[in-house]
A protein has these predicted regions:
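Rossmann-like dinucleotide-binding domain for NAD(H)/NADP(H)
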Residues: 79-82, 87-179
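Rossmann-like dinucleotide/phosphate-binding beta-alpha-beta segment
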Residues: 1-78
Length: 179
């Protein structure tokens, strides 16, 4: 499994994979990431040469917008599965569709899309004449979710804790050790 981006979400994904006994290769744009015994940091070229599954966990930056394009896809040695729970702008949708059509990409799990704005609520109407979007909707090997993959029980608890702490710090009370 190739992981691009090893911040909080990338690390969390890698930890979840430990129970599946898979080799994890990680590309992170920092020179040296902290060794944690979970995966092996590799160059982008080595990741492209070894990964059968590619999972994206990157922020949106000038380096990541359009990162997964036709050139990147063609440089993957193996046919591969693509997971994008990061930013929709990281994957060029037309390149993804072409990769799916020629079986370079075996399937995709997409929690984010290049076309999405702040929410999914209007995406179907806005993209109704977009052939690439229509292809993704109709593909049996594509799973789309409306940018909710990170909404786990753990993330809800963490969000509630952070909000509670901010409210209490603003009003001068503490919630530590209160249940």
């Amino acid at each position: 499994v190739g992981i691009i981006g090893y911040g909080t979400m990338g690390k969390s994904f890698a930890k979840k994979l430990q129970g599946f006994d898979v080799k994890q290769v990680i590309y992170h744009d920092l020179l040296h990431m902290e060794e944690d015994g979970i995966g092996t940091q590799v160059s982008l070229e080595e990741l492209q040469a070894t990964a059968d599954v590619l999972s994206l966990h990157t922020p949106q930056t000038s380096l990541t917008v359009g990162m997964i394009n036709t050139k990147f896809i063609n440089q993957m040695k193996n046919n591969f599965w693509l997971l994008n729970t990061a930013r929709g702008s990281a994957v060029v949708t037309d390149a993804l569709v072409n990769g799916l059509k020629n079986n370079k990409i075996l399937g995709a799990g997409l929690d984010v899309l290049e076309y999405e704005s702040s929410s999914f609520e209007n995406i179907f109407k806005a993209q109704e004449d977009n052939p690439s979007f229509s292809y993704l909707l109709g593909s049996e090997n594509v799973l789309l979710s409306p940018h909710v993959a990170g909404w786990t029980l753990e993330s809800h608890r963490k969000l509630a804790q952070i909000i509670s702490e901010k409210i209490c710090s603003t009003f001068g009370t503490s919630i530590k050790n209160k249940s």
